[in-house]
Amino acid sequence: MIGLLLVLHGSKIKEWQEIVINYAEELKRHFPLVEYGFIEINEPKIDEAAKKLVERGADTIVVVPLLFAAGMHFKRDIPNQLKETSNKAKIIIAEPIGFDKRIVDILKEKAEKALSVEGTSYQ
């Protein structure tokens, strides 16, 4: 069975956890096993979330980093934190978000909304 593991940096700001919980809930419509883990600061850590997926029956875990680029967290920290779990399940790490034109639309929408709140429009 396939498990989906959302991975993000972590933050002392509570909203980070709320955001990933919302993404996880939406993704449960497409994947039966979804967990999330943080690289640092917050709980659960990546390895704990991966172990939970294995306990729930995952034999393959697709790790989806909520990161924009393949920096040290992507290249070093995520694989290192999943070493133990890789003996129990196949680990597939998806690419970071990177550049995606769909995100350009979201950024444009956010900018337009900010301008409208100020009572200004760029058009």
From Swiss-Prot:
Pathway involvement of the protein, from the record: Cofactor biosynthesis; adenosylcobalamin biosynthesis; cob(II)yrinate a,c-diamide from sirohydrochlorin (anaerobic route): step 1/10
Q: Which UniProt keywords apply?
A: Cobalamin biosynthesis, Cobalt, Lyase, Metal-binding
CDD domains linked: CbiX_SirB_N
Q: Where does Co(2+) bind?
A: 9, 73
Highest taxon of source: Archaea
Output the HAMAP family linked to this UniProt entry. CbiX
Q: What is this protein called?
A: Sirohydrochlorin cobaltochelatase
Q: Per UniProt, what is one Pfam family of this protein?
A: CbiX
Q: Write down the Gene3D superfamilies for this protein, in alphabetical order.
A: 3.40.50.1400
List the EC numbers from the record: 4.99.1.3
Its recorded reaction(s) are:
Co-sirohydrochlorin + 2 H(+) = sirohydrochlorin + Co(2+)
Q: Say which family it is in.
A: Belongs to the CbiX family. CbiXS subfamily.
Q: Name one GO molecular function term.
A: cobalt ion binding
Binding, substrate: 43, 68-73
